Amino acid sequence: MTTSTQPGRSGTRTGPALATLALGAFVIGTAELVIVGILNLIAKDTDVSVGTAGLLVTAYALGICVGGPLLTAVTIKLGRHLLLWSALAVFLAANALAAATSAFGVLVLARVVSGAVHGLFIGVASALAAHLVPPGQQGRAVAMVFGGIAVSTVIGVPLGTLVGQQIGWQATFAGIVALTAVALVATLVLVPRVGITGPAGLGSQARHAFAPRVLAQLGVGLLLLGGQFAAFTYLASYLEDVTGISGGVVSAFLLVYGVASAVGVFGGGRFADRGAARTLVVANLALALILTALHFVGKNPALTAVALAVWGLVGFGLVPSFQLRVISLAGPGGDLAATLGASAVNAGIAGGAAVGGWAVESHGVDSVVVLALTVMFVALPATWAASRWLRPPAAEPTPSETPDTTRTAATDAVEAPPRPA
């Protein structure tokens, strides 16, 4: 196993390494979300209904939520560099399989594998990003990884959808394969070889990663992401039915949200460095107020556009703080916990979409914003309590570490919240 070279201390390779991790996240984010834009094409070519084709979205989410932590658990003793390029290699193979087949069952399998590798890569990449930089810069480092995903929604997904519509959905997957190959080579060349950043044993990692303080923070994340996506999943329908816009104007409004989200992730990294726990509380309160405002101004297109921009900034701006907080609270189990954080984000998205769907069917599309703002207000006491009462454990050097590798992403990551008065 390789040992840490602590490149973040010298800064000689940190920038290119973080950019490479962001590139990998961009490719993975594109692959996850582009399926929505080509779903009808796949349904037609594979002779299934659009509803059945939607299983490709479910399969990917299942891979992230279940497969990601499982893969992390069985590979916990491997070096981070090896895991990153191996994950990209498997991701490349899975998408190559998707590009080469017209069998729906094979596509589902490819999506499950891709999702599992997605969970592994994002968890390892975010923990490694925090490990590569000095204290005080780790929020921005984690934001680079999640920023890659955010940028994919603005650039990768629209381009991938366009390729699918003009050439064919297999060409979209072929493009993902090509981009993955670039990210793979860049990872081999530019990402430092770093060994494990916590205890080598699965039992020790799991004991810290599944500690009550971490599970409580994951629960907060589920509420924050789930509440947002209860509304966002049906935003296009909301804009058409409530705001009264259609066609290209809806796309423009969604683009406003997407660009704001990308900006929010990168900006959110700086706030995470200043205080991740505090940032989550402020973001939670802001989201509750923004969604309340959207409920009252939803029929006014101009004010709705402003609300969407602020929502995107804040809603995605909290993600680096959430992930960094999870890593911090896990202490020596930060590597495994990082994957749990990524899984919680996707579980929140899936759960929010499901509950939002129930609201649409039962009460109409205008109810999803009310549902989302209600969840935000319900989450606020939990977010505040987590920020005040949950504290990272003390640093624990382990037998697998030398004096040069005892620094972990967790021990440097986030300030301990103030002790209760």
Language model segments and positions:
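Helix-breaking motifs and short loop linkers at transmembrane-helix boundaries and internal kinks
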Residues: D47, G79, A100-V106, G244, ...
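Conserved MFS/SLC helix-loop-helix module at the cytosolic interface between two early adjacent transmembrane helices
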Residues: V66-S102
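Helix-to-loop junctions at the C-terminal end of transmembrane segments
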Residues: G68-R80, G264-A276, V360
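Primarily marks hydrophobic transmembrane alpha-helices of the MFS/SLC 12-helix fold
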Residues: H81-L84, L107, L280-V281
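Paired small-residue
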Residues: V90-L97, G105-S114, A302-V310
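Cytoplasmic helix-loop-helix junction between adjacent transmembrane helices
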Residues: A110-I149
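C-terminal membrane-cytosol helix-exit motif in multi-pass small-molecule transporters
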Residues: V177-T197, A382-S387
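C-terminal transmembrane helical hairpin of 12-TM major facilitator-type secondary transporters
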Residues: R278-F322
